[in-house]
Swiss-Prot record:
It comes from Emericella variicolor (Aspergillus stellatus). The gene is andF. Fe cation binds at residues 128, 130, 205. The lineage of its organism: Eukaryota, Fungi, Dikarya, Ascomycota, Pezizomycotina. Disruption phenotype: Impairs the synthesis of anditomin but accumulates andilesin A. Belongs to the PhyH family. Pathway: Secondary metabolite biosynthesis; terpenoid biosynthesis. This is Dioxygenase andF. Keywords: Dioxygenase, Iron, Metal-binding, Oxidoreductase. Coiled coil: none annotated. It comes from the Eukaryota.
Length: 285
């Protein structure tokens, strides 16, 4: 099978060009998505957390996709100030999400995030699509809007040898029920720290095998329309931590009211906005 190429674009690529590539190929890498200071800050803030995390699946539904030498700790908005105050504010994330979800769904919010850490000796992850967590994906047609999108960002180099993520460009256009792509159709996303792989829910992908002597580490942030319940709740975050965030991130994490495409309010307090009822402030304004 002839697979389209995986596109690598610079940070200053016009968003219209990025959306065109996503429509045609289903995925791409944005170079220097994060600056090196942000990369290092995230690494410093999560390193002890990751090192003390036991590898392997934590839930039954993870058994097929989380290997015995994979660490995927979540709760990053609590563990990393850089993640909650800078990464989740990223202009590229919101430019893409607004165009992907806005016209059909209206507002979107944060679904969940985790570290993507592979120890040496980890095997190849089964090839999968992220939208299988949504039962309605069984009825989704290739021309329908995606149900979710994931931004996978590199904290270390991603190579073929250390288990960098592989994708099958063009597979987002396959009909439902299509078999996963063959191994020879998977294309490695070769990334430097700070690069980001954009993965809509319909894109077939998987982590590679880590045949190197070093760990491979990245982290993710996924978003979906506000019609859907997020994997992660953030109502355990201290109030002072929430008020350090921008109003946009507060909305992403469920502390503000959202609007559907027809301006119907959801996640509201009575007939008013949740943020008004709780007296929420943002010192980031």
């Amino acid at each position: 099978m002839t697979v389209p190429q995986l596109h690598y674009v610079p940070y200053d690529t016009p968003v219209e060009d990025v959306m065109r590539i996503l429509e045609e190929c289903g995925t791409l890498v944005i170079r220097n998505f994060l600056d090196q200071k942000t990369v290092q800050n995230v690494q410093n803030e999560v390193d002890d957390y990751v090192r003390n995390w036991n590898p392997g699946p934590k839930y039954n539904h993870d058994i097929k996709t989380v290997g015995s030498k994979t660490k995927q700790p979540s709760n990053l908005s609590l563990m990393s100030k850089t993640y909650r105050c800078e990464v989740l504010n990223h202009p590229w994330m919101h430019a893409i999400c607004e165009r992907m979800f806005g016209p059909t769904y209206g507002d979107y919010w944060f679904n969940g995030g985790s570290i993507l850490h592979l120890e040496p000796g980890e095997h190849t992850q089964p090839i999968h699509q992220d939208h299988v967590f949504y039962h309605i994906s069984k009825w989704r047609r290739p021309t329908d809007p995606d149900l979710t999108i994931n931004f996978a960002m590199a904290l270390t180099e991603f190579t073929v040898e250390n288990g960098g993520t592989r994708v099958c460009p063009g597979s987002h256009l396959w009909e439902n029920g299509h078999a996963p792509p063959a191994e020879e159709d998977m294309v490695p996303a070769l990334m430097q720290p700070g690069d980001a792989l954009i993965l809509p829910g319909s894109m077939w992908h998987s982590a590679g095998a880590n045949r190197s002597s070093e760990y491979r580490r990245g982290f993710a942030a996924s978003f979906h329309p506000c019609h859907f319940t997020p994997i992660e709740s953030h109502h355990h975050l201290p109030r002072e931590m929430v008020e350090e965030m921008s109003p946009l991130v507060q909305k992403m994490l469920g502390f503000r009211t959202l609007n559907l495409h027809n301006n119907v309010k959801v996640w509201k307090a009575g007939e008013g906005n949740l943020e008004d009822a709780t007296g929420l402030k943002s010192i980031a304004v």
